Amino acid sequence: MKVNLLIFTIILCPTLCFGELFLEITKGSEDPYKVAMIPFEGNSRLSKELNFIMQNDLIRTGEFSILDEKLLLPLQIIDDELVYNDWKLLGMDYLVTGKIIKTNNSLDINYEIYDIHKKRKIRSSKVFGIPNQIRQLAHYTSDGI
């Protein structure tokens, strides 16, 4: 009898324990990180497409607020040092810059992330891709940010 009960429990338990979890994010962070994204150097058409996808990825997380492109300042570098004060006046927490490198059979992205408050580069990375997969490359890059 105990064996039959055990077998019945083993068979029935997984079906009873199965439940669907539905998670809906309706609101982002109360204080999202403020990020300025300079259009990447290189092919301007690809740069616009990359920036659009990456910005949307970051905004959808709810953790980031992206500075409107119309408010971007020219990137100032003096003696190989980024001028951080301009970005601090705009209330930015981070600055993202990058370069698109296109060769015959690859499309690579080099990008840097700067912490405006600490006045230093906090990440420098390279993402490798193929030319006809620009969307995937943009998603990989935004994942790194």
Predicted stretch roles:
Residues 10-11:
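Gram-negative bacterial Sec-dependent N-terminal signal peptides
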Residues 21, 55, 79-142:
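Amphipathic beta-strand/beta-sheet edge segments enriched in Tyr/Trp
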Residues 26-85:
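Short beta-strand->alpha-helix linker/helix-N-cap micro-motif
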Residues 1-5:
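Positively charged n-region of N-terminal signal peptides that target proteins for export
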Residues 6, 31-34, 94, 105-107:
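Residues at beta-strand starts and edge strands
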Residues 17-19:
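Boundary at the C-terminal end of the N-terminal hydrophobic targeting segment
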